Amino acid sequence: MQSLHLELTAGVDEAGRGPLAGPVVAAAVILDPSRPIDGLNDSKQLSAKRRDRLFDLIIERAAAYCIAEASVEEIDRLNILQATMLAMQRAIAGLSVTPQLVLIDGNRSPLLPMRSEAIVKGDARVTSIGAASILAKVHRDRLCAKLHETFPLYGFAVHKGYGTADHLAALVQHGACPEHRRTFSPVRAALARAAAHA
């Protein structure tokens, strides 16, 4: 009887705020208490192999989940914070079940039609946020592998779009591809250096 009074809660997290290229990804997950999943720690603490295994388990066992994106064009038009909030709103709206409460990793919550709470380091403290963290990170890593196939000069499969020395050198040498975030200062600076050498 007590379970009838439990609130339906979704955990939400994002991946890809810091990279210089590719979309920002958000995931929302409502876990099924009758189908527990072990090891739902923050995705950054797990090996890629373990994350991949957990990704499949979450999709198989969750009561509901949705993975959503905000594109590079949206990031450049809105700014990365607003694009992240948009991706989160899309992930929550895409759930097949409407939660009564949404728990979000971090210190900000998007505008939502239900109660929400931002939880700093929530990916390590709240199981459903940990699950969302894994879905978002694995989905984005797979997108970066596809980006690498389309734009092999930049090494997206290795650095996942982050501003490594090799990535910045490739930006100077080859210019930006359509998936680079042109409003990000390292991209602008690399393109300015490339133009100066032209």
Curated annotation (Swiss-Prot):
Disulfide bonds: none annotated. It catalyses: Endonucleolytic cleavage to 5'-phosphomonoester. GO terms for molecular function: manganese ion binding; RNA binding; RNA-DNA hybrid ribonuclease activity. The keyword Cell membrane does not apply. One of its GO terms (biological process) is mismatch repair. CDD domains: RNase_HII_bacteria_HII_like (cd07182). HAMAP family: RNase_HII_B. This is Ribonuclease HII 1. The lineage of its organism: Bacteria, Pseudomonadati, Pseudomonadota, Betaproteobacteria, Burkholderiales. The gene is rnhB1.
